[in-house]
Amino acid sequence: MKLKVCGMKYVENIQQVAELQPDYLGFIFYEKSKRNFEGIIPEFSNSIKKTGVFVNEYIEIVISLVEEYRLDAIQLHGDETVAYIKELKCQLESSRELKIEENKQIKKKKNQHYISKNDVEVIKVFGIKDEFNFDVLKPYLEVVDYFLFDTKGKERGGNGTKFDWSVLEKYPFDTPFFLSGGIGLEDVEEVKKIMKSNLPIYALDVNSKFESKPGVKRIEDLKEFKESVISSETK
């Protein structure tokens, strides 16, 4: 089971969370969010995947931020269509090929473009409350790496409330997904229970329930959660 900590905002806090070695760190690039990220992402382990969270953003802007911040994953939290994702992936590949070609022309290594060894992962978010029609996911199966199921609410994520996880019992696909939406320390036993199910849960996504204020994560609480849920899985 992987762990993603989303809504990172402040340099010192980012470094502290990174020391806990989550698998993903999420940075929200959405001006309407209280956790909108601007500035510099500090250096941390390459094993942690930098994830950019976008909401109905222009593809050109997504591409530019992927390149600027060397993002490993893109989380689409809006109404992005299959056509949008296909075009996004096409432009990502074109950008990658262009950089490879340009690097061949640049003799000094320090001036060469950074090129990720892996393709950028695409995570598509869907909101759930008391019920969900999983048929809407079918067209996305061929274009995403993962789904992320969050609580349908007023905000685009970070609402701090859980949806009815029993809805997921009807999930009919093999595509792995992130489980999100108001997960906190008080949910450890419930999380352990759903982890034992046959559902293809790839990762847990946590955010507001571990904050002292928007964008600032409580390190000790995250450490306890990781040790209780993620680490216990291997024992």
Residue ranges and their predicted role:
Residues 90-119, 233-235:
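Intrinsic disorder/low-complexity segments
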